[in-house]
Design a protein with these regions (language model features):
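Short, Lys/Arg-rich N-terminal segment immediately upstream of the first membrane anchor
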Residues: 1-9
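Cleft-lining beta-strand/loop regions that shape enzyme active-site pockets
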Residues: 2-3, 27, 31-43, 47, ...
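Hydrophobic beta-strand signal
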Residues: 139-140, 266, 317, 342, ...
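Structural motif
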Residues: 135-137
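Hydrophobic membrane-insertion alpha-helices, especially the h-region
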Residues: 12-28
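Conserved functional hotspot residues or short segments at active or partner-binding sites
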Residues: 355-356, 360-546
């Protein structure tokens, strides 16, 4: 893609030139995992000379390493939004969500008031075996105080993760105590899950939620499908809402389970990468089952590959809102110091031939696209969706569009009927999350005895958690507005209770609770009940009469 931009000669650009010279010269004259850098030498000589001039004559000593680290992200950002540089330190955790496991202590945590709070402890993991409990506050790591502004997600993960069988000493404060407990945890392999929920929506409909597409997503899906088969499911909903993508191969494996032999799943093509087709091999076990795929504005990349394959082959119905629109393929390439880049090398195309990548020539517009769509009303009305890309056709002849995500077959607007400014402030301020953590800590002993989401829901309603939240919010700057609270009562109660359920139980229980009155789930069940999950061919145009 040609991207003509005016470039001013600024210190940053000089740094970029230096880095390019470095890459051409001796500083980075090594391999990307066996792949040599190919850079045009005619330009390289000039830039390399510039590097030597700066190194020889610049008024101050130049730290070449610092220039590299600062300028690499800027270089790649000139290409596209998804080509990125990852430092060696960040590279340790960059792919943890997509790997089948990582080495750590086995906790889920949040950071509140500059302190790590243990949200959940993974069963039979290193932290649980050592005695760490949900609700603990971690204030020391290896005898060093770890609270305050330095406590970030990245820094916390860097300190808590580490090689298997190494030890980390934690200083924790337990709820209701003042004294620091010291606990030594031996790090171990922690499994990561992509399939975060799997259960029966009703007597016939199975439901699977996929958070991302990692190394183990396909086997996790097969296990979930096998369990649903034991329950006798005869139709399936795959929820990709909020799924930001992952490995293309994982999406292809899953699509293969539902498509017939020879059907195209996706193809990729780039300037240096010839077209490569990925087709179903006919061995999938669920080629005939009625299928619905749920997407929203956060569904991206590999999630869009799966949704596009199902839609273009008319294999099932897509329900939700228009997806993100990421149709670029990145290849990881590692430097000798273990830093790496993810470079866009190709685009992917759905079976009908459409590239669903949204335009990115204007970086500011690209980053602001989500808010632009929101303000334009696209989340609330299907008529507000603008199709600027070319039209394509599915196997049955239905019209679909490229250039900006997967548009669902059935649109589900964001629910704003009972939304008020009080609700928006309560959610956006983080007060609901803060209240949920506080309430959980204060009632953990009682709540932890409940293993069933519906038992917990009944209990929370009996405790009038909404009123408790309103009092908490009033004390923390969000003044009570009774009329608005009454109008948004259902939304507020749903949000408050869902976060408490998540804190105590797990993501499966949280998903089940939210799905019970989810408009997209309700529409899915209606579609299956009416036998309309398989898209039909467009009706022939009615004859004209004169």
């Amino acid at each position: 893609m040609t991207n003509n931009k005016h470039i001013r000669f600024t210190p940053l650009w000089m740094a970029i030139c230096v880095v390019i010279g470095i890459l051409i010269g001796s500083f980075y004259a090594n391999h990307f995992s066996g792949n040599r850098l190919n850079i045009i030498n005619s330009s390289g000589n000039k830039l390399n000379n510039l590097l030597h001039i700066i190194d020889d004559q610049y008024v101050d000593t130049v730290n070449v390493n610092d220039l590299v680290e600062k300028a690499m992200p800027q270089i790649l950002s000139e290409l596209d939004p998804h080509s990125v540089y990852i430092t060696a330190r960040d590279g340790e955790i960059a792919n943890d969500d997509l790997r089948g496991s990582f080495s750590g202590i086995g906790i889920e945590f949040t950071i509140r008031q500059d302190t790590i709070r243990v949200q959940n402890v993974i069963g039979n993991g290193p932290a649980e075996r050592a005695g760490v409990l949900a609700g603990d506050k971690i204030v020391e790591v290896d005898d060093s105080v770890f609270v305050g502004k330095k406590v970030t997600n990245a820094e916390a993960m860097h300190r808590l993760k580490g090689p298997k069988d190494t030890k980390v000493k934690l200083g924790v404060i337990r709820y209701g105590e003042q004294k620091i407990r010291h606990i030594i945890v031996t790090r171990g392999e922690i499994p990561t899950k992509s399939v975060t929920a799997s259960y029966m929506l009703d007597d016939e409909t199975g439901y699977i939620r996929i958070k991302n597409f990692g190394e183990n997503t396909y086997p996790e899906l097969l296990i979930a499908l096998a369990k649903l088969s034991q329950r006798g499911f005869s139709s399936l909903a795959i929820d990709l809402r909020g799924n930001t993508g992952g490995y293309l191969e994982s999406a292809v494996q899953i699509a293969n389970e539902f498509l017939s032999k020879g059907q195209l799943i996706v193809y990729t093509e780039g300037r240096r990468y010839p077209r490569q087709d990925y087709k179903a091999d006919g061995r999938g076990s669920y080629q005939q089952i009625p299928l619905v795929v749920l997407v929203d504005e956060s569904s991206a990349s590999a999630a869009e590959i799966l949704a596009g394959a199902i839609q273009d082959n008319d294999r099932g119905t897509i329900i939700g809102r228009r997806s993100f629109g990421k149709g670029l393929v990145q290849k990881p390439m590692e430097f000798s110091d273990h830093s790496m880049i993810r470079l866009t090398i190709a685009r992917y195309y759905t079976p009908s031939g459409r590239c669903i990548q949204k335009p990115y020539a204007d970086g500011e517009d690209y980053e602001g696209d989500w808010m632009k769509r929101y303000k334009h009303g696209e989340f609330f009305s299907q008529d507000s969706i603008k199709h600027t890309g070319p039209a394509y056709h599915t196997s049955n002849g239905r019209t679909v569009y490229g250039g900006g995500g997967i548009t669902p077959d059935i649109f589900i607007p964001e629910d704003t009927v009972d939304m008020t400014s009080y609700y928006k402030e309560a959610t956006m301020s983080g007060l609901i999350l803060q209240f949920a953590y506080t309430y959980t800590d204060e009632n953990r002993a009682r709540l932890s005895k409940m293993e069933d989401v519906w038992e917990m829901e009944r209990y929370l309603k009996s405790q009038n958690t909404l009123e408790k939240f309103v009092v908490y919010a009033d004390k923390n700057g969000l003044k009570r507005r009774n009329l608005m609270i009454q109008k948004s009562r259902k939304l507020l109660e749903r949000f408050v209770n869902s976060r408490i359920i998540y804190n105590i139980l797990n993501e499966q229980a949280w998903t089940e609770y939210l799905n019970q009155d989810d408009p997209a789930i309700i529409e899915t069940l209606r579609l299956f009940k009416n036998g309309d999950a398989f898209p039909k061919k467009p009706e022939a145009a009615a004859p004209n009469h004169a």
